[in-house]
Amino acid sequence: MDYTSSLNLLLVINGVGIPGRVIPNHLADRYGTINMLMPAAGAAGICVFSWMAVKSTPALYVWCCFYGITAGSIQSLFPAGLSSLTTDLRKAGVRMGMIFTIVSFATLAGPPIAGAIITASGGTYYGAQAFAGAALMLGMVLMAAARGVKVKRLMREAGTTGWGWHVKV
């Protein structure tokens, strides 16, 4: 792929990410931030896994549209999701700082790890794509666990029982 096409793909991902940043946040006001963040992370993981099947430039543009929407959703819902898991709002800033510090290490280490995987697999991207998709799916599972703990606490405080599928978190 030439340089101009790669820049166009970057513009497409960021451009289609705009509705991905706005619409899920609007829905999060009604259904809960974590309840919107989990499917967004799952959809992004599926998109990254499906990247392995993309073989042509037009298909890559289509893939960028889907991934841009899901990635934009994650980027905008993530900080709001952190605050929704915090019960004591005086600690929200400290918790966000701690989480963003942890995320910064992952952001710093992710590209070299992906590069090492690409080098080890002879220049193909399949291993790095699988690594990225698995990381997103693991993140979704961990968000589901955090949601489960929060819902259990909320239901215990309210004196109710059940699975808590309709709890806004």
Model-inferred region functions:
Residues 42-55:
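C-terminal ends and interior cores of transmembrane alpha-helices
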Residues 29-43:
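Cytoplasmic membrane-interface "Motif A"-like loop-to-helix N-cap segments
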Residues 84-85, 89-106, 115-169:
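Intracellular terminal tails of multi-pass secondary transporters
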Residues 1-15, 94:
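Loop-to-transmembrane helix entry
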Residues 13-22, 104-108:
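Residue-level signature of mid-helix packing/kink "hotspots" within the transmembrane helices
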Residues 73-88:
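Intracellular juxtamembrane helix-capping segments at the cytosolic ends
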Residues 20-33, 118:
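Helix-to-loop junctions at the C-terminal end of transmembrane segments
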Residues 58-67:
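Paired small-residue
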